């Protein structure tokens, strides 16, 4: 089954390092970054989980939970925790084994919103570690664009200018953005990032 943007993320029940979970219940009303990794006790995966653990306060600040999955048994995950803590300087959290598949050979990532909709998908080759700072940036963009009539340009970062969506007529844009905007083209109106 291929998951597409806008699909409801499938629910599942599975044993994890923190006990048995049902995915939708575990996610609650949070944003979720769900990612697969090829195998426990491998170098790239170890650095990725260390990076996730170090960034946990940033994910928490965005009301986002992170969950990793692989085909390895939960017992292996528990043994691997020590290596990650030792080599990455942070503890593993929310590492589970949700599927019994034996073919996970790539690094897939799904960002799922509080309504359980898939909002972003990325697939990396096994030899390329993920950029979790980019996933934080994507969450920032999704949360901002969900609550305002804006889009974020290439390489946008929190606090930088945004683009007013083309579907918003100028009259409504004047109400939503009283500080105004710069029109580079009729379809490209740049304004300050709205603050909630």
Language model: regions and residue ranges:
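Chalcogenol-based redox active-site neighborhoods
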Residues: 1-196
């Amino acid at each position: 089954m291929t998951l597409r943007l806008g699909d409801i993320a499938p629910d599942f029940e599975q044993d994890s390092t923190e006990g048995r979970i049902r995915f939708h219940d575990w996610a609650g009303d949070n944003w979720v970054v769900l990612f697969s990794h090829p195998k426990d006790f491998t170098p790239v995966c170890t650095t990725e989980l260390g990076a996730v653990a170090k960034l946990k306060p940033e994910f928490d600040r965005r009301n986002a939970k992170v969950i990793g999955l692989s085909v390895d048994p939960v017992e292996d995950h528990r043994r691997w925790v020590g290596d990650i803590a030792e080599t990455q300087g942070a503890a593993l959290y929310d590492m589970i084994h949700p599927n019994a598949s034996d073919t996970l050979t790539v690094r897939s990532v799904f960002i799922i919103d509080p309504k359980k909709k898939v909002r972003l998908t990325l697939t990396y080759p096994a030899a390329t570690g993920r950029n979790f700072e980019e996933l934080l940036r994507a969450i920032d963009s999704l949360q901002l664009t969900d609550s305002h009539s804006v889009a974020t340009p290439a390489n946008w970062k929190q606090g930088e200018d945004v683009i007013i969506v083309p579907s918003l007529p100028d009259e409504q844009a004047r109400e939503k953005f009283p500080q105004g905007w710069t029109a580079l083209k009729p379809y490209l109106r740049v304004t300050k990032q709205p603050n909630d």
